[in-house]
């Protein structure tokens, strides 16, 4: 292969560093109405009266819309394939506001000044009620977040709005309680992860206009163009055929833009007024009214026999979906399905969960999508079990880790683990971090100690039986190719990776591949860029489309030469016969566009019945100041099995970025609320994410397997890489200090207090 498995530079790298790409707001017409939202100051209240006359009289105001002006048909903002598994529990604006930041009115005007003035002129009378702000008391609470009778769940997954349940389920194989009784060693602990913000560089932003056919065009920074088309249609109660969605450059998403956070507001304004409009969320709005990671509490019981073989896992996840249920029923599933499976000998397991409504910001998708929370719990518990047995945590994992050709307990998306080098990943990570020399800790003097920790992880490659990747490849008259895609490049480099695949399939130079994405009127259908699906699902579609197009080009060239395809060869540049006759690709392309009914264009869709998991081992070295509790990550290594890395450089950058986000989750990030349900840390002044000085040396290596169902043997990588930092660093902190922190983030205060409690206990 000329391009696949090669570190090809991103096709847009130079334009990015020179500032040439334009983003959503750069493209918006100058005559757009400015759209802003009046948001609720209360966590749970009913709008008894809203006066908008004064606001409407302000010069330049085009419309002021309230709950009286919107469709009263419920819908969901979740970017999921229909029928969505998330409940339909929203109106665009509702009389019942359910969190601080819920929309109360939409204002659109000629200038930002006029809109800001109008927002202040709107007078609202609320009936404020007590809010549900604790996940532990939400279930069966007499205060209902969704008391309405038209709450609707397209797919029944245990939701009951009259119990504050978005979803609830129990899966069980074997007799877990009996097996745990037989185990020689058990642990029984609770682990708690908090909500985290995605903090992408570009906030949510959308502009809309009516085209000359009176169709609504939505231009938006989104990961899910085709789902946005359906969601906007549902929200406005209009046919999806009346909606066109165009994705410019995104400016980051990390899952936040897998929900339709901003699109419905300007879409409604443009539909009502007929005028172009735009909305640009402030950073504060993106932090109080978006779709952060689900807060989860995971109670785990784990048991092993006298030899260290894990026999039983009992896992219960309590997940906080907030005021609305986007992605609630699906994220929670990964907390068990992607964590229990890490221990291949498990004979009995139970995975139960409740997803509860609260009067807090609605959660959504974030890289890792629930697996991150579950893996933190299981990999922390695994270390605790190993320590209880007096066994090295690496040895413990060597005995239990996933192996190729064996089953993955609790993972429903592959019958047998078809591709896996976890054993090599573990051995290499152990070697790279210097485990034997550094475990469990080293005293560095001056009150500082260093410890090492390790963790395993797995994810998926698209959603089995649901996700669809699409590719449309055509030969242009000059011999170049246009590759139209329905997936969104969020900065991951998928446009480059898919062009690499196409170039190798067609035996052409990458510069001859022009990539176009995404316009729902032109691009082939694609579920969107989420669930680590693009390389695997869309990559397979690209390979199939290019393979078919290559056959057609060959056959057409052979026809031009008066021979059959079997009696000629095509090398990507020319079709040749053994007697020396030949025709060039450019000649074929030119002929195909002139008086010949032979279209040299192929559209293919791909969906997989399985989701082959990639695997990873992460190992961390931390330094802890025993007096202050300050934690510094000194070194982090990640060894990854993502099948064939199509572009090792881009895969490495993906890993480095995901590890950085994981470090933020484990050490810094925590969406905090007041007792009235207001978010305290709603800007970068208060919400701490790691900067460059907080990220250590990160070293990435690949131990490639070959996934026979993947494009060129590839699996996914995008989400997997955020899953190991939380448990690896938590385990390293424990090994350094003896303090086990089970609630994230692990702050200096928690560590320092833990050390003091240890010392007090020793004195007794």
Positions of PLM-derived features:
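Extended active-site and interfacial segments that coordinate phosphate-rich ligands
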Residues: 11-15, 120-127, 131-133, 223, ...
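Catalytic phosphate/nucleotide-handling subdomain of diverse soluble enzymes
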Residues: 461-523, 538
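Glycine-rich loop/linker segments at domain edges
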Residues: 6, 12-15, 82-83, 160-206, ...
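Thiamine diphosphate
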Residues: 230, 251-274, 278-279, 494-502
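Short acidic, glycine/serine/threonine-rich loops at helix termini
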Residues: 74-79, 118-121, 220, 229-231, ...
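C-terminal catalytic domains of large/alpha subunits in multi-subunit enzymes
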Residues: 67-68, 237-242, 272-277, 306, ...
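Helix-loop-helix junctions that connect adjacent transmembrane helices in secondary transporters/permeases
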Residues: 145-236, 401-480, 680-701
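Flexible, low-hydrophobicity surface segments
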Residues: 1-158, 596
């Amino acid at each position: 292969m000329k391009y696949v498995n090669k570190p090809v530079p991103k096709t847009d790298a130079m334009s990015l560093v020179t500032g040439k790409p334009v983003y959503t707001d750069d493209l918006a017409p100058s005559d757009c109405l400015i759209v802003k939202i009046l948001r609720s100051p209360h966590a749970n209240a009913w709008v008894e009266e809203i006066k908008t006359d004064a606001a409407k009289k302000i010069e330049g105001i085009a419309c002021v819309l309230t709950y009286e002006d919107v469709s009263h048909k419920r819908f969901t903002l979740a970017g999921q394939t229909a029928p969505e598994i998330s409940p339909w529990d929203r109106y665009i604006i509702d009389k019942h506001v359910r969190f601080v930041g819920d929309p109360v009115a939409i204002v659109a005007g000629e200038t930002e000044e006029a809109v800001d003035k109008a927002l202040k002129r709107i007078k609202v009378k609320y009936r404020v009620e007590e809010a549900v702000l604790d996940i532990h008391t939400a279930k069966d609470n007499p205060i209902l977040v969704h008391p309405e009778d038209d709450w609707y769940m397209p797919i029944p997954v245990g939701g009951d709005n009259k119990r504050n349940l978005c979803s609830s389920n129990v899966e069980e194989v074997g007799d877990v309680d009996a097996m745990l009784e037989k185990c020689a060693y058990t642990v029984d602990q609770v682990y708690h992860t908090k909500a985290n913000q995605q903090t992408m560089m570009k906030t949510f932003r959308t502009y809309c206009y009516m085209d000359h056919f009176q169709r609504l065009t939505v231009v938006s920074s989104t990961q899910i163009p085709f789902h946005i088309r359906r969601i906007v249609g549902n929200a406005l109660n209009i046919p999806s055929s009346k909606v066109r969605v165009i994705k410019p450059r995104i400016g980051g998403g990390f899952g936040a833009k897998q929900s339709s956070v901003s699109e419905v507001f300007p879409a409604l304004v443009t539909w009502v007024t007929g005028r172009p409009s735009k909305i640009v969320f402030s950073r504060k709005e993106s932090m109080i009214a978006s779709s952060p990671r689900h807060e989860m509490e995971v109670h785990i019981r784990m048991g092993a026999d006298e030899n260290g073989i894990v026999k039983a896992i009992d896992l219960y996840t309590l997940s906080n979906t907030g005021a609305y249920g986007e992605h609630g029923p699906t994220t929670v599933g990964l907390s068990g399905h992607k964590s229990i499976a890490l221990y291949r000998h498990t004979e009995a397991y139970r995975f139960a969960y409740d997803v509860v409504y609260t009067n807090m910001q609605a959660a959504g998708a974030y890289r890792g999508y629930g697996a991150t929370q579950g893996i933190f719990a299981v990999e922390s518990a695994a270390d605790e079990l190993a320590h209880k047995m007096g066994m090295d945590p690496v040895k413990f994992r060597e005995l239990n880790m996933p192996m190729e050709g064996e089953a993955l307990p609790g993972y429903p998306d592959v019958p047998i683990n078809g591709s896996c080098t976890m054993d090599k990943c573990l051995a290499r990570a152990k070697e790279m971090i210097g485990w034997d020399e550094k475990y469990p800790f080293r005293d560095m003097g001056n009150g500082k100690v260093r410890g090492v920790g390790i963790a395993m992880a797995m994810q998926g490659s698209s959603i089995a039986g649901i996700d669809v990747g699409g590719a449309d490849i055509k030969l242009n008259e000059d011999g170049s190719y246009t590759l139209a895609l329905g997936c969104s490049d969020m900065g991951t480099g998928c446009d480059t990776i898919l062009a690499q695949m196409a170039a190798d399939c067609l035996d052409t130079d990458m510069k001859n591949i022009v990539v176009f994405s995404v316009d729902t009127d032109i691009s082939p259908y694609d579920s969107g860029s989420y669930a680590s699906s693009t390389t695997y699902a869309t990559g397979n579609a690209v390979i199939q489309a290019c393979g078919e197009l290559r056959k057609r080009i060959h056959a057409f060239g052979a026809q031009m030469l008066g021979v059959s395809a079997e009696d000629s060869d095509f090398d990507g540049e020319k079709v040749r016969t053994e007697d020396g006759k030949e025709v060039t690709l450019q000649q074929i392309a030119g002929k195909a566009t002139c008086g010949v009914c032979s279209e040299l264009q192929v559209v293919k869709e791909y969906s997989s019945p399985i989701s082959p998991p990639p695997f990873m081992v992460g190992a961390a070295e931390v330094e802890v100041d025993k007096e202050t509790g300050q934690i510094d990550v000194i070194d982090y290594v990640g060894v990854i099995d993502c099948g064939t890395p199509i572009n090792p450089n881009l895969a490495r950058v993906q890993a480095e970025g995901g590890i950085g986000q994981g470090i933020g989750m484990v050490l810094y990030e925590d969406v905090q609320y007041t007792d009235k349900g207001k978010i305290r840390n709603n800007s970068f002044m208060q919400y701490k994410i790691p900067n460059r000085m907080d990220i250590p040396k990160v070293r990435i290596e690949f131990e490639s397997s070959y996934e026979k169902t993947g494009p060129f043997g590839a699996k996914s990588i995008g989400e997997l890489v955020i899953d190991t930092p939380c448990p690896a660093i938590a385990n390293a902190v424990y090994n350094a200090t003896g303090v086990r922190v089970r609630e994230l983030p692990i702050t200096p205060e928690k560590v320092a207090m833990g050390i003091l409690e240890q010392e007090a206990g020793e004195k007794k």
